[in-house]
Amino acid sequence: MSEMTPREIVSELDSHIIGQDKAKRAVAIALRNRWRRMQLNEELRHEVTPKNILMIGPTGVGKTEIARRLAKLANAPFIKVEATKFTEVGYVGKEVDSIIRDLTDAAVKMVRHQSIEKMRYRAEELAEERILDVLIPPAKNNWGVPDESQEPSATRQTFRKKLREGQLDDKEIEIDLAAAPMGVEIMAPPGMEEMTNQLQSMFQNIAGQKQKPRKIKIKEALKLLIEEEAAKLVNPEELKQQAIDAVEQHGIVFIDEIDKICKRGQTSGPDVSREGVQRDLLPLVEGCTVSTKHGMVKTDHILFIASGAFQVSSPSDLIPELQGRLPIRVELQALTTDDFERILTEPSASLTEQYKALMATEGVTIEFTREGIRKIAEAAWQVNERTENIGARRLHTVLERLMEDISYDASESSGQSITIDAEYVGKHLDELVADEDLSRFIL
């Protein structure tokens, strides 16, 4: 798991997300507390439970982006889910328990990748030997078995050197490789994904791993053999146990759009995708044991981060038990013109940099002036104020409209340089921004 300090985490988030310092600090502290807990003695460690977070803020201000970036920083099992995808137990649709199953699958994949990376050096050696056995078969004793007591021949060592230097990459050889597992597609109604996964695993296990001769270039064969040999060196049972432990101790679940499962006003009849889902989430957030195909997983120490815009509802519309299990509240602020200007220039892969790089592939050089960027930011802010406020996502719409002519003609304009200044932006956007009906439908 990540050993970054809160200040380092915030600094890393700052290079991708503008503003929202309170939210960044909250997730940075929560992530660091995961590491701090693991430094405690076992008795006290069991008592320290994570403080779950509720992020509140309008759409397009960075809630989901914080989750995406956090997933890369955490170096721990992480899953992002939409609250609207789930229904109450007993109804058609996904149950909330599938969150933990998916998290465990992600952990198994992560732990397997880490284990294979650790074994890569040994796997590379074994893969080399298998290729050399095809190129220069080893000497055999009187019983027809390869004689391992003999030193490798000078020819074999020469070929090994050539193989490592890449001189044999384009040479074709015939070698036995593990055949791809038999694929069995099973159609099942929604909510039955777990059953179909188990059936598919069963059919694959019945088929077993078979070796199949293939004619292939050495470069490709080496890649496949390294993966095959690394997989043999990994213990599947040990890997499953490590994955379950990683989920239980370091797992993070991000639940987006939680405001969409709030009960609004008094409604009669079953509310299978709102209050029912909240009730089903309670045991997961509080701590329970979920059965997965890899084993039983306890959720007591999994960190839950929920987020929602809460534009037509408020956090108090969540059922009281769930409110109590999300003790840390963080409010994200609506974006201003200055924020939009910073979003266009400061992040490491800002929108303006992306458009410059895209046009450079056609040989067109794009330059954004400071005044032009300010004008784009003002246009996006004005449209947000007059119509629906969709936050930073409005910049995508405005920029796409602004760049439409350049993008269309780029393939015939190789070698040109185009400067996007305040005058250029005004010429292409002023009419749309001023006309509320046009901006409502086009921007």
UniProtKB/Swiss-Prot annotation:
Pfam families: AAA, AAA_2. GO terms for molecular function: ATP binding; ATP hydrolysis activity; peptidase activity; proteasome-activating activity. GO terms for cellular component: HslUV protease complex. Keywords: ATP-binding, Chaperone, Cytoplasm, Nucleotide-binding, Stress response. ATPase subunit of a proteasome-like degradation complex; this subunit has chaperone activity. The binding of ATP and its subsequent hydrolysis by HslU are essential for unfolding of protein substrates subsequently hydrolyzed by HslV. HslU recognizes the N-terminal part of its protein substrates and unfolds these before they are guided to HslV for hydrolysis. Gene3D superfamilies: 1.10.8.60, DNA helicase RuvA subunit, C-terminal domain, P-loop containing nucleotide triphosphate hydrolases. A double ring-shaped homohexamer of HslV is capped on each side by a ring-shaped HslU homohexamer. The assembly of the HslU/HslV complex is dependent on binding of ATP. The gene is hslU. InterPro entries: AAA+_ATPase, ATP-dep_Clp_protease_ClpX, ATPase_AAA_core, Clp_ATPase_C, HslU, P-loop_NTPase. Its main location: cytoplasm. SMART domains: AAA, ClpB_D2-small. Transmembrane segments: none annotated. This is ATP-dependent protease ATPase subunit HslU. PANTHER family: ATP-DEPENDENT CLP PROTEASE ATP-BINDING SUBUNIT CLPX-LIKE, MITOCHONDRIAL-RELATED (PTHR48102), ATP-DEPENDENT PROTEASE ATPASE SUBUNIT HSLU (PTHR48102:SF3). ATP binds at I18, G60, V61, G62, K63, T64, E65, D256, E321, R393. It is found in: Cytoplasm. One of its GO terms (biological process) is protein unfolding. Belongs to the ClpX chaperone family. HslU subfamily.
